[in-house]
Amino acid sequence: MKSIKTKIIVTVILCSLVSTFICGAISIVNSVSTSYEDSQQEMQLKCVSQSDELDTMMQNVSQSVEMVYSIAVAKLEHAASFRTSKDYVDTYTKQMLPILMQSAQNTKGALTAYIRYNPEFTEPTSGLFLTRDNSDSEFESVTPTDFSMYDPSDVEHVGWYYIPVQNGKETWMEPYLNSNIGVYMISYVIPIEVDGESIGIIGMDIDFSEFTDTIDSLSIFDSGYGFLVNESGKVMYHKDLEIGSNLADADSGLQSVVDALGNEQTEETAVSYTYQGKDKVMYYKTLENGMKFLLTAPKTELQEKSRQLAKQIFGGAAFAMILTIIIGTVLGFTITKPITQIDGIVKQTAEFEFASNPANQHLYKRKDETGRMAISLHNMRKNLRQMVA
């Protein structure tokens, strides 16, 4: 038959283990869920803040062009003369040169700046074209592109002029490679219209690396990164994929990303997908120029904090269980020790051994039930000794 000591130890340990297990399990489930949500929120905020930074860069460009546009329209006092007088056009161009030059020099990343006129009533090389090879060099004025050499439908060479004119509003062009200097550029162009008639355009070409360097400097968790696409999933910038390729063509798992880009309700929300066999999560935000900035990371990295927290809770629970076993064992021995001593006294009494044991004296001083039992047993032994005597 099991002793009271064993029963007490087992009871204490079982109760402690059950409570520790239940509390630990609840803590792990809730903490893991909360930690994963925190990782998602961190990723969403990172996506928004990075998008805002890119938008700020674009706004600096658009503000520069819009300032030149406002001055250009204000100085265009006689639109009719602009159509018929070469001298008027030349004078106007000279007035705009220092204004365009100053604006271009003060715009970070600007490589070209231009004011071009409608080739239907001006010379095919009319206007201004400022260019430089990199952001550290000075702008120089060169002869503008000869419109007579290209058909208006030639998007590659003169799309930067005709597309904004056809749109009838300010337009961000998609990034393109300037083969002359081997640099990817992105353009912001505003058409000039007076009384509903197209006069020309004003625009700037910005070194696209100003944007991509910012994206490359971004990191999230261990291997998360950002990239740019347009609304249809065409790659504008990606560290692994070729510019101009489509996400859906790169990996079938990316079709869900393309689908999400066309759904406004998914913007700034977590979108799960697979890429190269890995489960990933992405957030995206639409930029000022219509491009989409995407921030992506492996799902396992979002769950890493959850796993670490679960390990800590599990480790704490395991330590608590071990400590409980030790404390339960010590308490069991402590609680049952006086009972064991009283049991020994009872056995001595049954064998009529009435000799006093100094080791049992402390039992009489106890204030609990064992103390009262010891005193009662002492009195009984005393009476038995008198009877035997």
Residues covered by each model-derived region:
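HAMP signal relay modules and closely related sensory coiled-coil linkers
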Residues: 334-382, 386-389
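Short regulatory alpha-helical segment in sensory/regulatory domains of signaling proteins that mediates
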Residues: 55, 73, 100-108, 215-221, ...
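Cytoplasm-proximal transmembrane signaling helix
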Residues: 17-21, 292-346, 350
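Intrinsic low-complexity, intrinsically disordered coil/linker regions enriched in small/polar
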Residues: 210-293
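Extracellular/periplasmic ligand-sensing ectodomains of membrane signal-transduction proteins
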Residues: 82-90, 103-170, 174-182, 234-252
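Sensor-regulatory modules in signal-transduction proteins
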Residues: 178, 192-194, 275-277, 287, ...
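Juxtamembrane extracytoplasmic/periplasmic/luminal helical "stalk" adjacent to the first N-terminal
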Residues: 6-10, 15-91
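Conserved beta-strands of PAS-like sensory domains
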Residues: 181-217, 281-283, 292-301, 305
